[in-house]
């Protein structure tokens, strides 16, 4: 996996994965979610879906600290695309809904709240710099 960093920032902009379709660089902010389907994982972006034969646990480690949360044993979601979480359902900006299991619900909700508060702080810093 190759990592590409943004200029003058520590944030990762894109990651290269060995998909079935070939080695492809995926911009982190375009990856909506990763879903397990049998023995492969599907990377859903706005444009298309890519498949890879790799454990979701491995993918989760690679995306750690980049705004993704494991909401289900089969789903890893980019929190930038979560509109809201309520009544054990994760509502995405794309209109899709993913069930959140009852035991994971408090963890997922807390991670999303932390993400929102950190995103708010980042926006405050940008406004102060302008």
Model-derived regions, located:
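Conserved binding/recognition cores within well-folded domains
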Residues: 2-93, 97
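Context-gated lysine
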Residues: 5-6, 55, 102, 109-110, ...
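C-terminal output/interaction extensions
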Residues: 107-125, 129
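N-terminal regulatory/sensing modules of transcriptional regulators
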Residues: 1-9, 121-130
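C-terminal structural segments of small proteins and small subunits
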Residues: 92-110, 114
